[in-house]
Amino acid sequence: MKRLHWIWLLSLVFANPDGWGADALQARQWCVSALTYTANRDVADPFDFERADFSAIFHGPAGAEWKVPGFWDGGRTWRIRFTPTAPGRWHYETRFSDAGEKGLHGQVGTIDVQPPLTDTPLHQHGGLLQVSSNHRYLTYSDGTPFFWLGDTWWAAPSANVPLDVFKQQVDVRLAQGYTVFQMHGHRPLTDSETIGAFEATRHADAATLRYWQQVDRYLAYAEARGMVGCIGFARGDMFDPISLTDLQRLWRYYLARYGAYPVLFLITQEYNIEPDKRQQYLPKMLALGQFIKDTDPYRRALTAHPWARSRDLGQAWNEPWLDFIMFQAGHRRFEKPSAYHEVWQQPSPKPFIEGEANYEGFAATNFNVNAAAIRRSAYTALQSGSFGFTYGAQGLYAGVFDHAKPGPTFRWGPVLTWKEGLALPGGAQLQHLRVCYESVDWWKLEPRPKALEPSADVLVKADGAATLLLYYVSKVKLPPGCHLKDLPDGQAYAATWFDPRTGGTTKLPDGCVVKTEKLPLPAPPDTQDWMLILRKLGSK
């Protein structure tokens, strides 16, 4: 197993205010660091963040200032995890609600932060993702465009997705170019345990501590390997009996414990599901979104996972805390490009991501989600404005171990295990999607739904007249005279066919030339789906 890279995690134990050494600590930009303290006495309820509020104020180069929440980690041990956002010298001072608790309050220190590592993009550019200045995509912490290619492991972390399985999933998907995993694990981590996330901020006991320290190992592994987690808890209607205070208690602890990691938050799966229950829980969900945004010291991009598009009323879309829109096209159907265009054309744009569409292996009498369906769903979303795509697979999304114990997956078609879902061809073929888009400046591309005349089942995305990507759906029939319109007369383009199944490319030897502001569309190599990449050549 590859050695974990978070060697910059600092562990300093303070039994009293005189425990400081004279030398500055060492850390790395964009890597998780941790400070460890020992309280002078037991805290009755360490999850009560109003009466036991532990934090540190960090001051860094160029006036940087971060207030980072801390967390209880067993007995009298408390920690603060922090990701330095710039190289140079940082100073910090701790705060605790009870200023008389000198083991936790008023501790000061210095950290010398070295430039970032380059072993993974997350360590090089920072995994606390932000919204781009034009509100069309997400960026790494340093502003570098972030390409979202995600997989769905809703059951992680839990007994359905034990740590060794999680590691296999991370390793396979990273090798295929994936950058994100989505999960809403809230269940116990073994069959013998009774504590999951919702129970894990109620009592400061050994079972609770064991739960959190096991979850640590999941997120530490993903961070070390270079994969972003997009995380929530359960499903919206399951929050009905839980008070907003208890939800805030859970999220305050979660943010303190994992906020320094390269993670995003989707709050829950399907935050606005079930209209007959919605009024009982939806106001809590929206208020919780603002609480998460206000508590997160890094103000990272925040979203909420919605119900299927045909039933999604977009209640969170205009909330000030919602930074990007997560879309759910749903299953066993193809979403129309116009549905994505509507989101793209919002008066006050927010980036949007297709977060759940056609899990591979789902099947019905008239619709089989195979690799071709996966490609069509993914390329349609990106060509229509989504800044990425999240894949999902039967069995894998729910952590199925045994065909005889399928859980809810039996409703969606033939039962698969997580390992069978991980090996499906559509998931592997999406590595080529990322290669395709990263072969150009993908973040400069915009959907062009009216670029063709007459219209055809070819989706166009373009950077003005400089670079154009044309996705031909399978079995497309080009009408006579179909062309790209409104291009510079006489302009020549290098033209390349990109095969979404293999990643192979074939250049058109004569390229394409605009005549009378029209560029005739070439026919695809065969009846399967293809991407045509056009790159402007020199001066016309």
Predicted regions and their residues:
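Bacterial N-terminal signal peptides
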Residues: 5-15
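Extended acidic/polar, glycine-enriched regions
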Residues: 66-133
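Short tyrosine-centred short linear motifs in exposed loops/low-complexity segments
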Residues: 28-31, 76-78, 82-100, 476-480, ...
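Surface-exposed loop/edge segments in extracytoplasmic proteins
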Residues: 62-69, 502-510
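Non-catalytic, glycine-rich low-complexity segments
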Residues: 20-62, 68-70, 110-117, 126, ...
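Catalytic-core region of carbohydrate-active enzymes that cleave or remodel glycosidic bonds
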Residues: 319-403
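Aromatic- and carboxylate-lined catalytic core of secreted/periplasmic carbohydrate-active enzymes
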Residues: 23-27, 42-47, 359-362, 372-509, ...
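Active-site mouth of glycoside hydrolases
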Residues: 53, 116, 122-335
